[in-house]
Amino acid sequence: MAEVRSRSRRTESNWATICCSAFSCLQLYWARIVLRKWFNVSASESDYSADSDDDYEDRSQEFDPISSGVTNPRVDTDGNVIYRPKLRRRNSETFRMQYIDTKAIRICAGTWNVGGRVPSSDLDIDGWLDTLEPADIYVLGLQEIVPLNAGNIFGMEDDQPALEWENLIRDALNRVQPRKLKIKSHSDPPSPSKFKQPEEVPYSVEDMFVETSHDACDGISSMDNKLNSVESTDVPIVSEDSLTNIDVLGSTNDNASCLPIQEYLQRQFSTPNTPDRSLSMQINSDSKREERFSYTERVGLSWPEPPLRLLNQYVSERRGSFKSVNLTITNLRKPSYVRIVSKQMVGVFLTIWVRRNLRKHISNLCVSTVGVGIMGYIGNKGSVSVSMSIYQTPFCFLCTHLSSGEKDTDQEKRNDDVREIHRRTQFLPHSLNANELPRSICNHERIIWLGDLNYRINLSYEKTHELIARKEWQRLVEYDQLSREMTKGNLFEGWSEGTLDFAPTYKYEIDSENYIGDDPESGKRRPAWCDRIIWNGKGMKLFNYRRNEIKLSDHRPVTATFLAEVEVLSPRKLQHALTLTYAEIQGLDA
């Protein structure tokens, strides 16, 4: 009996030890997280979140020792490969503009102080995102995404509101059809060609073969004829449930799909008397000929004869094949936009969304956070910054929440916050490029800074409301603190902002169109343009700068739409430049 009791006591002791150890580990883990949050210490790995796509091959993350400037791999004692950066010459005989094209992308930047309120699932944010004119990149910053109480400031981070906002943004973006980019080369105009190439081209091979009904057949005229307008062909939407009803070999109305491979290819790459549906020929009364090709046949226009490596692809992707149907269904299921980064620091939240096909052209993504709140380091105030390369152009996006208050000392504190964010924001280089120095904000070619900057209007409460009632925005801007600082060059020297031709965005009564009035606790609050979007860098054009009438919080959201130029590496132009350089070298040697 005594032995049984002793064994039971040992078991209880073991369980107590295990529970105490687990509790101690949990305490240490919680303390570690809180200390990291207090002193704004980043983890060794990137701690931002992003969408994952199993079907997407992220080529930007692949490492190629040759293209990355790293050669002569060595192996350490553990079998790990050590790469040594190779030396690069300082001056190149090949000028950059000889192998670079320019492309314009549309960027929609939005900022909103949501006051710690969680959105409902039916909240309409289409106006804030400007979905009527879809952008290629959406840079959205939220402030006070969680209430700024002691628990959220000093305790564990609550990411549930961020998830709800992301779901709302995702639903809004994926209800629209993204635009196509127009490739325009200023330094290398296209040479005369027999065929007039379309201005809009697909971004990937899969988009080349799967298009919407109004893009299925675009006219390509000869050089002597102008491009005539043609009626679009309605393409039925195929559901997955109807796959069993599809005749793989085609119906009686589609005789081409029943032809042998050789005869089918001859039809596709010749000029038949009776054209196939996918390659139609129209001859009008004026004997003007117009050829209409689908994107599948346009690939063949680059060669005088059908390329052998594409013959099987044409046959397998013709109408009625399983491959074309499955490809269509797969692309219809994929979202139009994907989230490439989301980062939260207490109440400051920055999320960036891009077109799905633009994702592979984004690289060197890095995140930096700077807390300037309590004790100058806590993240209740501060910035979340993202650095990335879009094609070959470095961009920097910042979401900030600066110190509040209407006193003169509060304005100086905001100025100090901006200088501190500039000083402490650093984007560490990739581990393989250890010789490079950390990149600061000003080391980027295009910069967009948005957020609740909290700058006020230096007028009395009564005078401010009087100018607002008369909509005299220009006179009101003369007393805006941020506009004055930028004009004097004390802050954001060389930066730009759109015209403030809308009412101040702060401070409103909740779910109301009225500015907040007399408050026994806080007194009179003067309206102000607290929510701002400014930018720096050449090659950026502002389309619109406006506020949106969403009454969720005491702030109104603000949107700015830009057209930004990016540099795109042109392999054809690079090969041409290298050929000329090689010829010059051979001439000097001779």
Curated annotation (Swiss-Prot):
Region feature (Catalytic 1): 445-460
Ranges for region Catalytic 2: 523-538
Intrachain disulfide bonds: none
Single GO term (MF): phosphatidylinositol-3,4,5-trisphosphate 5-phosphatase activity
The protein's enzyme class: hydrolase
Deletion consequences: No visible phenotype. Slightly reduced production of reactive oxygen species (ROS). Alterations in germination and in early seedling growth. Enhanced sensibility to abscisic acid (ABA) with elevated levels of Ins(1,4,5)P3.
InterPro entries in the cross-refs: Endo/exonu/phosph_ase_sf, IP5P_plant, IPPc
Tissue-specificity statement: Expressed ubiquitously.
Gene3D superfamilies: Endonuclease/exonuclease/phosphatase
Catalysed reactions, semicolon-separated: 1D-myo-inositol 1,4,5-trisphosphate + H2O = 1D-myo-inositol 1,4-bisphosphate + phosphate; 1D-myo-inositol 1,3,4,5-tetrakisphosphate + H2O = 1D-myo-inositol 1,3,4-trisphosphate + phosphate
GO terms for biological process, alphabetical: abscisic acid-activated signaling pathway; inositol trisphosphate metabolic process; phosphatidylinositol dephosphorylation; seed germination; seedling development
EC number: 3.1.3.56
Acidic residues compositional bias, start-end: 48-57
Entry keyword set: Abscisic acid signaling pathway, Hydrolase, Phosphoprotein
One Pfam match: Exo_endo_phos2
Location of Phosphoserine modifications: S60
Residue ranges, annotated region (Disordered): 47-73
Induction: Induced by ABA at both transcript and protein levels in a specific, transient manner.
PANTHER family xrefs: TYPE I INOSITOL POLYPHOSPHATE 5-PHOSPHATASE 1 (PTHR45666:SF30), TYPE IV INOSITOL POLYPHOSPHATE 5-PHOSPHATASE 9 (PTHR45666)
Similarity-based family: Belongs to the inositol polyphosphate 5-phosphatase family.
Function field: Has phosphatase activity toward Ins(1,4,5)P3 and Ins(1,3,4,5)P4, but not toward Ins(1,4)P2, Ins(1)P. Seems to be involved in the abscisic acid (ABA) signaling pathway. Could also be able to hydrolyze PtdIns(4,5)P2 and PtdIns(3,4,5)P3.
Protein name: Type I inositol polyphosphate 5-phosphatase 1
Species assigned in the record: Arabidopsis thaliana (Mouse-ear cress)
